[in-house]
Amino acid sequence: MFNVLGARLQQKKRTIAFPKEEPVLPDRFRGRPEIQQSLCTPDCRICAEACPTDAMRRDAEGLTLDMGRCLFCGECAAVCPLKAIRHTTDYRLAVRNRNDMILKGSEVALASALQRETLRLFGRSLKLREVSAAGCNACEADVNVLGTVVFDLGRFGIQFVASPRHADGILITGPISRNMMLALKKTYEAVPTPKLVIAVGACAISGGPFIDNPEIHNGAESTLPIDLYVPGCPPHPLTILDGLLRLIRAR
């Protein structure tokens, strides 16, 4: 016991000061994409053809990038001869509306807080039930790590619970396979109202690399109303945490 206490005193505090202090991320971190329309030529489609999920498209206003489909693979930036696309180190990606994930430049309408009455209920205590709907465990792992001493999700009043009956909402990962659809619906119905639905990762938002597969429902939006979208493949733990805190007005 004394050895344990001694080790604790020696290690001191290991929890990051986020959100009071901004995290320091490596230069290689692939965060929010940025499109420089001025560098892009109107007839070029090299990046769109290279994108594995059809996240890059061109309309009358220029290039658009759908972060809900984006795998953050960096292929578009790698093949662009004019370097009109790049990934910044900005980890803040969570939004409230699906259309806010369509980028035309560098600005993102970050997630706003819940409405006043809902915020009164969940602002200081938010219990979530996680549903892995045919996920690969990457998003699940980055959600799980929020419970470690580094991030300490519980200090914000947010916790994951074992039963949907004890939850205020569900957090979904995975592309929603046909075999998981019934389980997802039953979990949603078991959560008392009012309730929240959070889609984490490209798979849960759009189907990710499995888009239009006959066994996949292309994300949760076709089935449930989504209150928070957290794009990424997988999203960084800080991206998920930032979105959750914005939802309960802790940022």
Q: Over which residues does each language-model region extend?
A:
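Non-ligating segments of multi-cofactor redox enzymes
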Residues: 1-50, 54-59, 78, 88-95, ...
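Iron-sulfur-associated redox domains of electron-transfer enzymes in respiratory
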Residues: 61-71, 77, 81, 86-251
